[in-house]
């Protein structure tokens, strides 16, 4: 997006391997008894097959956990990603829905569609994963009609949690 972390941190994306993360989780769980985690990665699952390998390693190491992530709707609807996330203990995902207006999403350079927001939300809920939306109101050139589209989307999709920026 043209206003998010990418312009701040640049185009470089650094991520630990699933094996490294599973090792860290095992350590934290063993030494501190933690069973719920917030994964601090605003595009969790960006690298192909990362989520699938993460799920496999958690099961192999017998590490049942519950966790929360932030991700993008276009990443989540790829292949078997949602199924793997649900099977590995995902409790809630925060997505940058931002707006129910395609015009506003395009102005933000989100690279997603309103339809993808709907699809992803339905798929996550089918797997009993809570869905939370980050929304923005007052984006440059946003009209009342754009705001009404966002309100309509929220009423139809009924996210479990909402964070609003104005």
Task: Please place each PLM-identified region on the residue numbering.
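Radical SAM [4Fe-4S] cluster-binding motif and immediate context
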Residues: 1-134, 139, 152
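C-terminal accessory regions of radical SAM enzymes
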Residues: 130, 145-166
């Amino acid at each position: 997006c043209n206003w998010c972390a990418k312009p701040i941190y640049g185009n470089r994306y650094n991520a630990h391997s699933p094996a490294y993360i599973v090792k860290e989780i095992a350590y934290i769980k063993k030494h501190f008894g933690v069973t719920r985690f917030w994964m601090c990665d605003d595009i969790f699952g960006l690298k192909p097959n990362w989520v699938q390998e993460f799920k496999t390693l958690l099961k192999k190491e017998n590490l049942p956990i519950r966790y929360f992530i932030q991700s993008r709707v276009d990443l989540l609807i790829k292949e078997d990603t949602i199924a793997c996330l649900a099977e590995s203990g995902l409790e809630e995902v925060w997505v940058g829905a931002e707006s129910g207006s395609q015009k506003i999403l395009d102005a933000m350079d989100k690279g997603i569609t309103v339809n993808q927001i709907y699809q992803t939300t339905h798929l996550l809920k089918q797997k009993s994963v809570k869905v939370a939306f980050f929304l923005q109101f007052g984006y440059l050139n946003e009209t009342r009609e754009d705001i009404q589209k966002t309100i309509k989307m929220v009423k139809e999709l009924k996210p479990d949690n909402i964070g609003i920026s104005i």
